[in-house]
Amino acid sequence: VLPCDDATPQESGLPARALARAGCRTLLYSANSGSMRVDVQPGSFLAFTDHVNFSGFNPLSTEREDGGWPTPYLSMAELYEARLTTDFVAAVEAAGVSMHSGVAGYWTGPSFETPAEIRLAQLAGCSISSNSFLPEVMAGYHAGMRVVAFTFVSTMSAGLGPPIALDPVLGLTRKAHDDFRTILRASIPAVAADRGPASG
């Protein structure tokens, strides 16, 4: 459940924390997004190398060093671990699915972003806009998991294409079912085989 569906950021991160408690070492997360780049068209995939949080909240803001969790005052510099992301992209492309890389911009939604917000995000170096991913990946990383995140690009961001509507976004996403299956089948063994250190 996402913040745009009336969950708190902390509640949105609970599934990732549960996976960490169950012993998972790596979180492979997929999102849906709009593109800010002309070379990343709807129907494309993009792996995250970093993110910019435009939401005004931090999902770790109420976390404390209790319950077995580490300090919430942790560096985000290696949230999207470069080596693990490189392994992920290589495995996916070897399976025949093209994977771009770039910086993700995060908003809570549920409304789509304004053209002015997208222009600001482009100045910040963002490649895509999304209202899912941030609470989950930050909670997973805080809980000690390594993180790989990617997105399916289902539309162009506001001001860069036709007006955004939900039905076409969902329709294009459904058509990508086979590519999603290929990505998961190819990448899960690759990221599981990379036994680098988890954070925390």
Report each predicted region and the residues it spans.
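Active-site rim beta-loop-alpha module in soluble metabolic enzymes
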Residues: 77-122
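Metabolite-binding pocket within alpha/beta catalytic cores that recognizes anionic/polar moieties
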Residues: 1-76
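His/Asp/Glu-rich mid-to-C-terminal helical/loop segments that flank catalytic regions of hydrolases
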Residues: 157-200
